[in-house]
Amino acid sequence: MFAIVRTGGKQYRVAAGDKIVVEKLPGEAGSTVSLGDVLLAGEGAELKDVKGLTVSAEIIAQAKGEKVIVFKKRRRHNYRRRNGHRQQHTILKILSIGGEAKAKKAPAKAKADAPAAAEA
């Protein structure tokens, strides 16, 4: 299952287990955040209703981007200014989309084996 979420003025296509870099979100590394602004969700070619759907993600790290140099110059006026800027980012790992966890598939196989063992 995939979803399109909006955070920090940008849109991201995410699925369970993906890692994305977004604009800075409040929180410590290891904490869980919920991305509630889901624009689209689907499975393969089918689209699902996004009403009340949330995307759960874990904060992996708070980081800074590459340094961007801002250089201003006015020729023939001996005017030069050099400033640097590093944008703050948050690295997220998507845990689940709409309550559907990635780990739910493994217990389903265990439940299927249990009735087979009971019949034998």
From Swiss-Prot:
One BP annotation, GO: translation
Xref: InterPro entries: bL21-like, bL21-like_sf, Ribosomal_bL21
rRNA-binding keyword on record: yes
GO molecular function, one term: structural constituent of ribosome
Annotated Gene Ontology cellular component terms: cytoplasm; ribonucleoprotein complex; ribosome
Record key words, sorted: Ribonucleoprotein, Ribosomal protein, RNA-binding, rRNA-binding
Lineage: superkingdom: Bacteria
NCBIfam families: L21 (TIGR00061)
Purpose: This protein binds to 23S rRNA in the presence of protein L20.
Stated family: Belongs to the bacterial ribosomal protein bL21 family.
Summary of subunit composition and partner proteins: Part of the 50S ribosomal subunit. Contacts protein L20.
Name of the molecule in the record: Large ribosomal subunit protein bL21
Organism: Rhizorhabdus wittichii (strain DSM 6014 / CCUG 31198 / JCM 15750 / NBRC 105917 / EY 4224 / RW1) (Sphingomonas wittichii)
Lineage: Bacteria, Pseudomonadati, Pseudomonadota, Alphaproteobacteria, Sphingomonadales
